[in-house]
Amino acid sequence: MGTPVSNSSVLKRSLRKKSGLRNYDENLMDEVIEKHLGATLKRKSRTKEDLEKETETEAMIAVSLGFPIDALLEEEIRAGVVKKLGGKEQNDYIVVRNHILARWRGNVRMWLSKGQIKETVSNEYEHLISSAYDFLLHNGYINFGVSPSFTSHVPDEANEGSVIIIGAGLAGLAAARQLLSFGFKVIILEGRNRPGGRVYTQRIGQEGKYVAVELGGSVITGIHANPLGVLARQLTIPLHKVRDNCPLYKPDGSPVDKELDSKVEVIFNKLLDKVMELRQIMGGFAYDISLGSVLERLRKLYAVARNDEERQLLDWHHANLEYANAGCLSELSAAYWDQDDPYEMGGDHCFLAGGNWRLIKALCEGLPIFYGKTVNTIRYGNEGVEVIAGDQAFHADMVLCTVPLGVLKKKAIKFEPELPQRKLAAIDRLGFGLLNKVAMLFPHVFWGEDLDTFGCLNEQSHKRGEFFLFYGYHTVSGGPVLIALVAGEAAETFECSDPSSLLNRVLSVLRGIYSPKGVTVPNPIQSICTRWGSDPLSYGSYSHVRVRSSGSDYDLLAESVGTRLFFAGEATTRQYPATMHGAFLSGLREAARIYQAVRVRQNYHRKFVQKNVGPNNDMLAYLFKKPDLEFGKFSFVFDSLVEDTRSMGLLRVTFDTSEGSGQEDLGTSFRDSFDLPLPLYTTISREQAHELEQVAGGDECRLSYMVNSLGLKLMGPSAVGNFCNSLITNIVSTRRGRGRNRLFVEQP
């Protein structure tokens, strides 16, 4: 949701040079990529030198998107994109894959078809085009998002199955759009009366003048390769780079000396470096130690930040770290708190002009979302899923749960059967903390038009996170909006404090800073205090790696349970936790997993049917078009030339597990069974058939009688064909002979 003021790491305040531009347009990316790739797309007709240059450029684009420069992703290996790892085929595949990625990134507003790729790549690589294109499409690397041109590519009929998605946040919305494009039936159940989840843009103001205020996730953290940047480009929404200048002020309102500020920042970063060295030495022992305790011991060991002003400055950096992790340093794992650092998105941190609701609104378009549906029970099994929300039951083939980790920790949803123990343990181990805000709309910008952030020190360490950082949203919100952040221990006490008291304290801080400068701080027109920890649909802000946890716990949360229950959300992504783009990417990931699960199930059914269709299958189908005796699921055929009651015939029992699923109203049933009608056979005498007909109680009782009293065993078509070939042949011959005689009699 929130991010620290940093460029490349959550460890440090940004030291980047100030940008000369206040705003920039992501649409310029189209021109940049086009310039590198050339004006024409006729790759086949390029010179060797041109092709080599383009291949290098496309490789760099792929690297910026997280692909290895000369290897396959683990997902690609699992998907079997090439027949043999290593060698020429893999190298050729990588070139084709990179070309497809670059082509789509060149214009993310247009659907990239497989046919378009075939126009620019030699025919000899057609099989690699299909392999790479299908992988990139189904795993959400191309053709994702909200471009209006994509709607025409959604199948008219949803034949892939049905999915219930719990939660209309970024994860749920991303998954829903992907699944619809794959041909699934989808509904979203959302407990709130709005979409977005922890991304919440509130409109405040008066007399028709309203502004956008971000009460939840606010900053796009690193624009390079960020899927939210792709959405912004598709919607032609400009982004505002968060400028680097972040002056700090003492508790009395006077500015912090810049030299002292730099000195303490160096101390802070060196302490973190020492933590890294120490945990390497300690090995597994660091697993049980908090980051806060190690930092404090090192501070005392090196005798740094001993006077009040230096300690307050160091506390400010600690508060910034607690903001980045939504947790107190005393809770963060010294061993793994920064395990996601290698995966951080590059580039500037940005605000979205007009607020993040613009992304949410676009993602919601065309999706069936049911608001006010707080889910309390999820039942899942071999036959599908049932989701209970209040007094309503919803049925589908699969369910995707995207609720926040805080909701899972509170056991607000009952799972039947219970989740696997390893997943429950991961839910318990991972941390889920707080970040709160005071959002204020003022009559005018008094803090300076050229300032996006400024910070304030606190006298007491336990209050270091209280109003420690201010964000000015006047550049993107449509008005003079200022937001004060509350992190760490202060965020917890904030939850039970009186809003008017909190506002007075914020104004006191602001007036302490600006009054000595001769600047009057007016009362806000309107203000809002968040309470994310008390919100029953989140119970917190975002996740972190707590003591005795590790990054692998994110992987455990992401694991599906069988092929019916799936999980997404920021707390299910090891690489991008606690970020908006992480939530979005997890939705794309789970859409791919659901699609793959269906493919596996369909392949299983196809192989099962093929296995049970023997050479006599056509004969069996012919015989049972007109059975001699039929009741319920039971059909019988006999040799009409043999009247003996002990003579043998064939019995077919047809199992159709989709019976009863029906096409009920959407609110009560949303299932489209994968299962096919399954005919099974056995031999049976005329006498036994009539015995079976007399059994009362319906088909279940007849089946029980057939097995237990008559001792009959059902077989597939192939088995019965091998076992009863002569019997089948005799009955067919009799039927055909009878038909020929009848034909001759009926002729004039």
Question: What feature does the model see in each segment?
Answer:
Residues 123-129, 716-718:
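Short, basic interhelical loop/turn and adjoining N-cap
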Residues 43-70, 74-75, 112-118, 132-134, ...:
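FAD-dinucleotide binding site
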Residues 1-12, 17-19, 243, 247, ...:
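Plant-biased detector of terminal regions, especially N-terminal secretory signal peptides
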Residues 616-748:
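Feature captures hydrophobic
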Residues 94-121:
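Short amphipathic alpha-helical interface segments
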Residues 108, 403-409, 639, 656:
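Short, proline-centered helix/strand-breaking motifs
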Residues 1-100, 126-140, 144, 148-152:
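Long, charge-rich, low-complexity intrinsically disordered regions
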Residues 85-88, 96-106, 187-208, 328-332, ...:
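Short, composition-biased local secondary-structure segments
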